[in-house]
A protein has these predicted regions:
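Juxtamembrane C-cap of transmembrane helices in multi-pass membrane transport proteins
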Residues: 224-233, 445
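C-terminal membrane-cytosol helix-exit motif in multi-pass small-molecule transporters
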Residues: 181-200, 216-228, 245-259, 454-462
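Helix-loop-helix hairpins in multi-pass membrane proteins, especially solute transporters
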Residues: 72-210, 362, 396
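Flexible interhelical linker loops that connect adjacent transmembrane helices
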Residues: 9-12, 140, 188-216, 234, ...
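Alpha-helical transmembrane segments of multipass membrane proteins
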Residues: 100-101, 166, 220, 224, ...
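Short, Lys/Arg-rich, polar N-terminal cytosolic tail immediately upstream
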Residues: 1-14
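A gly/Pro-rich, aromatic-decorated transmembrane alpha-helix motif that marks the paired
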Residues: 151, 155-171, 220, 224, ...
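12-transmembrane solute porter fold
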Residues: 18-34, 39-43, 50-64, 69, ...
Length: 463
């Protein structure tokens, strides 16, 4: 039998094996990021085909992010028990099948269910890049490996909207669901060849399934409560009851995590004020990143008459600039005050959102692209500095749990951010069943205010 341990694979393929393994995991991450971004340019077409409004279509983005946020906390247990090869290959197989089924969806409910399934598998795959790099590379080569891995991760959101726009305009929105499948199919083949099996069966420990179920129910119910606010007239009691149940479930989750031997979220970390402030900043970052990625394509297609391809091309320069900004901001975060860099990023993004909030239908493509770039520069400065500010004050043994927590918080901010901006657009002014430019202006102002207010706790990080 072939030796599929780390040493066995290195002996079989030589030093290039490490890079083949990194490329394998990168394929999984690229597929999930592609899936998260490519659908946004298809939302307008989906609304028209199914005759639905913001109150339903936003679940294609919100459901994906919420499911990803919840299941990413389960990846550590799966990696410990099954190893990176079986976990990644299994998640990619399921992701592929769900994507294909979603492409044939006949109702909005079926499509939303497929997006939730995609998000659940994406949550399992997303943390594996850093895990693998730290397992197979020596300390002095990890930075280089993360840089190569990061290039692929950044490439996907830059190209995703362009690919999605082309598929929608030339074929159908259904091909947006099919798009990640070839990538994950190749990833399954490579995973079975290049990813290691664990050298021995690890000592088993109980997975915190009650915690995961409580967390998933809390997030889902809270998001649905927000969504139902558009039906406020005559439904106040139902909305209030749902909000109360969500609050009770959240309380039960906190109690569970405080008593569990292997909790999903280490509640004790929240005793560190700097970590709490950084997590508030991370929630604002999630709202900024996912909220703007949702809003920009829908805004320019619905209010400005852009095609799906034009909407994707509008996002492309911003994705490239984000890829350039990210490593630069990372180097600055090692030398400069983290809070100053984050506040600078907040200011840049808030300025971008305010410029969108005062735009009109005569605005040229170039100006819209420039404002999108401005927002991505802000996000590029926020992301690495927030991680530095959150993790630097902690003890070495807390870093793993803290890293997982801040990633979770950022995704949670994204899930609620998309829901809130979609609700704002839905409540706004409409004409012929579609939101007017004024409805989108309200959403952009809301995003700008939310992100700007986050500067207050971020400044108190003292990092």
């Amino acid at each position: 039998m072939a030796d599929n341990s780390i040493d066995g694979l290195r002996a079989r393929y030589g030093d290039r094996w490490r890079w083949l393994a990194v490329c394998t995991v990168m394929l999984g991450t690229m597929a999930t990021v592609l899936s998260a971004t490519v659908v946004n340019v298809a939302l307008h077409g989906i609304m028209l085909e199914f005759g639905i409004r913001q109150g339903q279509v936003h679940w294609l983005a919100t459901g994906f992010i919420a499911a990803m946020t919840t299941t990413m906390l389960a990846s550590s247990w799966l990696l410990d028990h099954f190893g990176v090869r079986k976990t990644l290959a299994g998640a990619m197989v399921l992701f592929t099948l769900i994507s294909i089924v979603g492409g044939f969806a006949g109702t909005p409910g079926q499509l939303i269910a497929a997006r939730i399934g995609q998000g659940a598998m994406a949550g399992l795959m997303q943390p594996m890049g850093m895990y693998l790099v730290f397992r197979i590379f020596p300390r002095e080569r990890r930075g280089q490996a993360m840089g190569i891995y990061g290039m692929g991760v950044i490439l996907a959101p830059a190209l995703g909207p362009v690919l999605g726009g082309f598929l929608v305009d030339q074929l159908s929105w259904r091909y947006v669901m099919f798009a990640p499948a070839p990538v994950t199919m190749l990833g399954v083949f490579m995973a079975w060849r290049f990813l290691p099996l664990p050298p021995s069966r690890p000592e088993p420990y109980r997975f915190d399934l009650p915690g995961l179920l409580l967390l998933g129910a809390t997030i889902g119910l809270a998001l649905d409560t927000l969504n139902r606010m558009q039906e406020l007239a005559g439904a106040e009691w139902r909305i209030g009851l749902q909000a109360l149940v969500a609050a009770i479930l959240l309380g039960l989750f906190v109690v569970r995590e405080r008593s569990a031997r292997h909790p999903l979220v280490n509640i004790a970390l929240l005793r560190n004020p700097a970590f709490v402030y950084a997590n508030l900043g991370a929630m604002a970052l999630g709202l900024a990143l996912f909220g703007s990625t949702y809003l920009v394509p829908l805004f320019v297609q619905t209010s400005l008459g852009f095609s799906a391809t034009e909407a994707g091309l509008l996002m492309l320069p911003a994705g490239i600039v984000l890829g350039i900004t990210f490593p630069l901001a990372g180097r600055l975060a090692d030398r400069q005050s983290a809070r100053k860099l984050v506040v600078f990023g907040i200011a840049m993004f808030a300025a971008s959102a305010m410029l969108f909030a005062v735009s009109d239908v005569t605005l040229a493509f170039g100006w819209l692209a420039l404002w999108t770039i401005l927002g991505r520069i802000g996000i590029g400065f926020m992301l690495p500095a927030l991680s530095t500010g959150a993790l630097n004050p902690l003890k070495p043994e807390q870093l793993g749990a803290a890293s997982s927590t801040i990633n979770f918080t950022r995704q949670l901010g994204g899930a609620f951010g998309v829901n809130i901006v979609a609700l704002t657009v839905e409540f706004g002014e409409h004409s012929d069943g579609l939101p007017t430019i004024n409805a989108f202006h309200s959403a952009w102002w809301l995003v700008a205010v939310f992100v700007a207010v986050a500067a207050v706790p971020v400044w108190r990080m003292r990092a």
